[in-house]
Amino acid sequence: MREASVALMREPEILTANLELLLQSSEEVLASIEAMSPADRAEVSPEWVARMKASTAPDAWTHGFAVVHRASGARIGSCGYKGPPGPEGIVEIAYGIDPAYQGRGYATEAARALIAFALDSGQVRVVCAHTRPEKNASTRVLTKCGFEWMGERVDPEDGLVWRWELPSNEEK
């Protein structure tokens, strides 16, 4: 296993020291989008929502995970991938922790679990992430996870972003 000390229970439930990452169904994901504020919902990619509606069975690359705090059982966020690995072996991660639980290392712990799952899959050479083009909590999470800043990019969905990459050990 990688640095995150991830234990994979039933496929794919991921346990870390403080968190349980539970695979979500498309219905759960779509319900969580509906529960968002209109401003947050406007940031969700229509293409991604269409993929979610068309999916027939949950899978880790498409549906993502509910982040559950193991000690309390509370759902404290979500995390996942922006799709399956591409032909080049690149996958993008995304994560969000509810404000009441931020600042406690849970985003870093969830990100490390996603990284370990991706790199251990044998399908991924590089894990990437995009952030707003400024130093913020997400850039600190990625730095702690060993990502390297690759520069600015224009993302078709998000506009100007900073791109971060973490190659597998074989790629370094």
Describe the function of each predicted region.
Residues 142:
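Conserved active-site tyrosine of GNAT-family acetyltransferases
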Residues 1-92, 96-100, 113-121, 126, ...:
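GNAT-family acyltransferases
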Residues 129-139:
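Conserved beta-strand-loop-alpha-helix junction that forms the acyl-donor binding cleft
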Residues 105-108:
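Glycine-rich acyl-CoA binding loop
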